A protein has these predicted regions:
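N-terminal "arm"/small-domain region of PLP-dependent enzymes with the aminotransferase-like
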Residues: 1-40
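Active-site region of PLP-dependent enzymes
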Residues: 34, 183-189, 196-287
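Phosphate-binding glycine-rich loop
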Residues: 42-98, 112-115, 122-124, 191
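Short beta->alpha connector loops at strand-helix junctions that form conserved
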Residues: 103, 121-126
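Conserved coil-to-alpha-helix start sites within the AMP-binding
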Residues: 104-110
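Hydrophobic/aromatic ligand-binding patch that stacks against planar heteroaromatic rings
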Residues: 111-113, 168, 257
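Active-site phosphate-binding strand-loop segment of PLP-dependent enzymes
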Residues: 128-212, 218-219, 224
Length: 287
């Protein structure tokens, strides 16, 4: 809750936590989409972004989507159907079931759980990493042994002890969803973030390490899950010559124009990370 008091005064010059860094190559790919008239939700830019996202995270498949929230929603939906089967029409895949979630994160990490009818159970944060505490997660499983889904956010791009979290999840037969929205390019023990979860999501929002102004990718090693997510994202339209739909779908596909901006940013990912590290070093030295 915001408290108005003289103790808190705004900076004269605003200091941004994150802002877009553009380079110019992005316009080349946007122009290609325009010139070839691939302005909708298919095209070479989307294909390239999916390949780049999968390669960067060290997974087999990526599905380009309109936002990271959309990606997280489809991660949750895939996990729910994997655990509990397809629900009846009008019901979520997690209806009435508890889901362990990070408690220090943006609401987009949790909203998809609620979309699917799940009940978020917040797991305490580790004081050093600001991410989910493995010790608290173990205690939560002792209290609620029937829980089979964990949604873990890598706050500010720091993985926390994701390896230990994954071990705990697998020991309890739980599916792990990795919200790597802020962690693209980060590693834990030389393993890239985005590859630890059974499902993962990355973000291209304007405040992320690379951006398309919006957008996200769902990451998975299962081709059937990738294909199912892609189908859901196109209103779950069946492969027919007419409009045929047999399950609920969503309008979650990425624009080929937006994908052009993202495609042009990928070659600068390491540069952006180096800049972030330099800023961190300056703060650390100053403190």
């Amino acid at each position: 809750m915001y408290v108005k008091t003289e103790r808190f005064r705004p900076f004269e010059k605003k200091l941004w936590l994150a802002s877009p860094t553009m380079h110019g190559e992005e316009l080349q790919y946007v122009r290609e989409a325009y010139d070839t008239n691939w302005m909708s939700t298919v095209g070479a830019n989307i294909t390239a972004v999916e390949q780049l996202a999968a390669e960067q995270a060290g997974v087999k498949y990526a599905v380009a989507l309109s936002s990271c929230t959309a990606a997280l929603h489809l991660c949750v939906k895939l996990a729910g159907e994997r655990l509990y089967g397809r629900p009846a029409v009008g019901h979520g895949t997690l209806e009435g079931r508890r889901v362990f979630c990070s408690d220090m994160t943006f609401s987009a990490t949790l909203n998809p759980v609620v979309y699917e009818g799940g009940i978020p159970v917040f797991i305490d944060t580790d004081g050093n990493s600001w991410n989910m505490s493995p010790t608290a997660l173990e205690r939560a499983f002792a209290l609620y042994p029937d829980v089979k889904l964990v949604v873990y956010a890598e706050l500010y791009g720091f993985p926390g002890n994701i390896q230990k979290i994954r071990q705990i999840c697998h020991a309890h037969g739980a599916v792990l969803i990795e919200d790597a929205a802020e962690a693209m390019g980060a590693f834990w023990a030389d393993v890239p973030c985005g590859s630890f979860g059974d499902y993962a999501a990355v973000s291209y929002n304007g405040n992320k390490i690379i951006t398309g102004s919006t957008g996200g990718c769902l990451l998975t090693n299962d081709i059937s899950d990738a294909n199912h997510a892609r189908k859901w994202s196109t209103q779950a339209r069946e492969n027919a010559a007419w409009y045929q739909h047999e399950e609920v779908g969503y309008n979650y596909r990425m624009s080929n124009v937006i994908a052009g901006v993202i495609r042009g940013q990928y070659s600068h990912l390491d540069e952006h990370i180096a800049q972030k590290k330099a800023i961190y070093d300056r703060y650390r030295e100053g403190l």
